[in-house]
Amino acid sequence: MPVKIAQVEKCFKSAGPQPNGLQASADGLWCIDQRNNRLYRQDFATGEVLFDAQTDTVHSSGVTVGGGYVWVASTYERKIAQLEIDSGKTVAKYSSPGSGVVGWREGAADAQETGAHGLEWRDGRLYVASPPSQMVHVIDPEGWRETHCFRVPGLRVHGIAWAGDGNLWAADTSAGTVSLLDPHSGRIFDVIRVQAPDEVHGMTIHEGVLWYCSAANCDIGRLLLY
């Protein structure tokens, strides 16, 4: 099979110093920053900040919108925060599924437990990508119950995004790959490479094109295939 290498199109810089989660919506591009923990919404064309709010999350690594709320992965708190969509204020916090020590820190004396990264929403369920468990966990927010989980490829799963065919894109930041997965079995249908030094941290999809952000250099851009 041919190797698919994404052409990285850098669109604009993030509003915050370390963007780590991304979610496309009808009214703009949501971004959560892992350093200042601020929640932004930016214009797709210009990067203009349309919304800006301080959250009480900790070293956040994922964001999505669903059920009338914004959801943020508060990674170092090992929580998923449910926020008011018009203010960024916390409504509730829930235990982050799959929390633990990431594989590359296993056995280290100073290893710290952390939580989720990428988030997505579909059909009333929250999809939670967890680097410690190397899985995507499917959560029913009513009662905060895990209904399913499936393994994802790679060492460090990060952003996730729904493809138009109902499958799920998942980024592995350590390997520089984005894989297309069956959201029930985890079976891999396709793989895209993203060449260094570019890194995919947060990821989403808008008008059929994958968008990414990188905490390493504040880039927000698109992953194009020709």
What spans do the regions from the language model cover?
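Blade/loop signatures of beta-propeller domains
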Residues: 1-5
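Conserved beta-strand positions in repeat-built beta-propeller and related beta-rich domains
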Residues: 15, 31-36, 72-77, 128-133, ...
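Short loop/turn segments that connect beta-strands within beta-propeller blades
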Residues: 43-47, 84-88, 140-144, 182-186, ...
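A short beta-strand motif characteristic of beta-propeller blades
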Residues: 7-13, 48-53, 89-94, 98-109, ...
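Blade-level signature of beta-propeller repeat domains, shared across WD40, Kelch, NHL, RCC1
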Residues: 198-226
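Beta-rich, blade/repeat-based domains predominating
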Residues: 14-26, 56-66, 97-123, 153-165, ...
